[in-house]
């Protein structure tokens, strides 16, 4: 009974002093020893009692975050590839510096143009001293499909009548697209003249016909063909460029009423009636191509809207305006601008025309003799890995045998091994043996016979395999 009462007293003590340190005394194990007595006091006296301040939590040293590298990558220049984006690994680029990849790898030459998309500048590569046109598009002016132009270039195989794409990267919230440097646009070339002569007009028609046919054969639509997007080299070879509104027929529906991006960005001067309503197809490209040839061949005024817009699409054009064009080309343009899209000829059908076929044969012969630097030389990538391995030119086109054809023909001679040299002799003091051995030469000395040890001799003698 006494033990039960003692346990109850201990329990009461623990309950009353649950916030205090309680321990058993060494001298009297059954007696409780506390640091202070339990007493009733006022709030004033309680406030005067000094309490031990809580321990200070020392700040721990921050450990290296596993996401720190990912945060650094956001500020680094990233090259765009068909599978995503990667950090640029060029030796010309140092991520530790605040300068952009453009400042590291290029020298700025001049501004080529500005627009609602951004700007285009001419720059010279510091490693190759080649000139390029670099298109800069700020992120604030990019739409949802912000990489449409870059991926459009990647999906198009190289062609001599399409502006060549080299690479694209993102840096400092700006999309950069590195392109082939051309001389000027077709619109700038025609500025200040009435119209193109028949020979030049046919060359423009044939060059763009081949480039547009290459696009359509790869299931791509340009959607913005006009003289401003047709570029000329110094040798007057026309190339199709500016793929800001390009679309893939394999991944996007042809008849899509949600083509608001095209309806807002497309130029109404060169759009067909069905394209304005949102129906994009190869026939809408054919219409834009035909009306562009009409403009540079006749110097006709193309309104973006108004009373003159509809008569042109109905081919209600005065004869005196069409007079500078040849009859064959005029008939082709009329077919290309037919109000019924399905009645317009395709690029392959235009190439089968007997007049076009003959002129195309002559044009190809002319272009073959024109030195095209971008056509035959491999693409100069500034990064460690190519974003498009399939776009690189084949090594079979590189003529590497020129270095060996001019070399002097000699028969190599390999000297025989000399076993007569001692370890301490200098091998450079010994001449190589001649081709014709000399009699009684030290090179013909036979090796001295070495008799085997006696134990081995006795072993062979027992087996009758050794003759002395």
From Swiss-Prot:
InterPro entries: CC_SR_Kinase, Kinase-like_dom_sf, Prot_kinase_dom, Protein_kinase_ATP_BS, Ser/Thr_kinase_AS. It comes from the Eukaryota. Residues 25-63, 425-453 are annotated as: Disordered. ATP binds at residues 112-120, 135. Residues 106-357 form the Protein kinase domain. The active site is at residue 224. GO terms for biological process: cell differentiation; cell division; meiotic cell cycle; negative regulation of G2/M transition of mitotic cell cycle; negative regulation of G2/MI transition of meiotic cell cycle. Mg(2+) binds at residues 229, 242. The keyword Cell cycle applies. Keywords: ATP-binding, Cell cycle, Developmental protein, Differentiation, Kinase, Magnesium, Metal-binding, Nucleotide-binding, Nucleus, Serine/threonine-protein kinase, Transferase. Gene3D superfamilies: Phosphorylase Kinase, domain 1, Transferase(Phosphotransferase) domain 1. In the 12-13-cell embryo, expressed in the E blastomere. In the 16-cell embryo, expressed in the eight AB cells. Residues 49-61 have a biased composition (Basic residues). Its EC number is 2.7.11.1. It catalyses: L-seryl-[protein] + ATP = O-phospho-L-seryl-[protein] + ADP + H(+); L-threonyl-[protein] + ATP = O-phospho-L-threonyl-[protein] + ADP + H(+). It is found in: Nucleus. Acts as a negative regulator of entry into mitosis (G2 to M transition) by phosphorylation of the CDK1 kinase. This is Membrane-associated tyrosine- and threonine-specific cdc2-inhibitory kinase wee-1.1. It comes from Caenorhabditis elegans.
């Amino acid at each position: 009974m006494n033990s039960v009462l003692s346990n109850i007293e201990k329990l009461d003590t623990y309950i009353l002093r649950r916030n205090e340190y309680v321990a058993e005394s060494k001298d009297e194990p059954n007696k409780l020893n506390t640091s202070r007595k339990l007493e009733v006091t006022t709030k004033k006296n309680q406030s005067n009692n000094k309490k031990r301040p809580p321990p200070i939590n020392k700040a721990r040293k921050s450990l290296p975050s596993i996401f720190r590298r990912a945060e650094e990558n956001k500020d680094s220049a990233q090259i765009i590839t068909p599978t995503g984006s990667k950090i640029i690994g060029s030796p010309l680029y140092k991520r530790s510096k605040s300068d952009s990849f453009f400042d590291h790898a290029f020298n700025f030459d001049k501004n080529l143009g500005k627009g609602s998309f951004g700007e285009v500048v001419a720059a010279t590569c510091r490693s190759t001293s080649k000139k390029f046109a670099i298109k800069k598009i700020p992120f604030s002016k990019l739409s949802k499909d912000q990489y449409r132009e870059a991926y459009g270039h990647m999906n198009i195989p190289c062609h001599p009548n399409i502006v060549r794409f080299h690479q694209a990267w993102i840096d400092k919230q700006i999309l950069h697209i590195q392109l082939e440097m051309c001389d000027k646009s077709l619109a700038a070339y025609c500025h200040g003249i009435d119209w193109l002569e028949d020979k030049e007009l046919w060359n423009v028609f044939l060059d763009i016909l081949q480039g547009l046919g290459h696009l359509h054969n790869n299931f791509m639509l340009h959607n913005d063909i006009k003289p401003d997007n047709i570029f000329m080299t110094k040798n007057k070879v026309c190339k199709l460029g500016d793929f800001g509104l390009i679309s893939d027929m394999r991944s996007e529906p042809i008849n899509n009423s949600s083509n608001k991006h095209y309806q807002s960005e497309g130029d109404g001067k060169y759009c067909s009636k069905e394209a304005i309503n949102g129906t994009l197809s190869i026939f809408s490209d054919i219409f834009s191509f035909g009306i562009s040839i009409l403009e540079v061949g006749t110097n006709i005024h193309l309104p973006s809207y108004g009373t003159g817009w509809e008569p042109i699409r109905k081919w209600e054009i005065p004869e005196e305006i069409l007079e500078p064009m040849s009859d064959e080309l005029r008939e082709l343009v009329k077919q290309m601008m037919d109000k019924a899209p399905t009645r317009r000829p395709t690029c392959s059908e235009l190439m089968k025309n007997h007049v076009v076929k003959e002129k195309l044969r002559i044009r190809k012969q002319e272009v073959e003799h024109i030195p095209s630097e971008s056509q035959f030389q491999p693409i100069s990538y500034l990064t460690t890995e190519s974003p498009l391995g399939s776009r690189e030119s084949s090594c079979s086109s590189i003529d590497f045998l020129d270095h060996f054809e001019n070399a002097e023909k000699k028969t190599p001679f390999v000297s025989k091994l000399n076993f007569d040299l001692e370890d301490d002799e200098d091998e450079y003091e010994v001449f190589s043996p001649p081709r014709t051995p000399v009699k009684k030469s030290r090179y013909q000395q036979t090796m001295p016979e070495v008799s085997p040890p006696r134990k081995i001799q006795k072993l062979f003698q027992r087996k009758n395999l050794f003759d002395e």
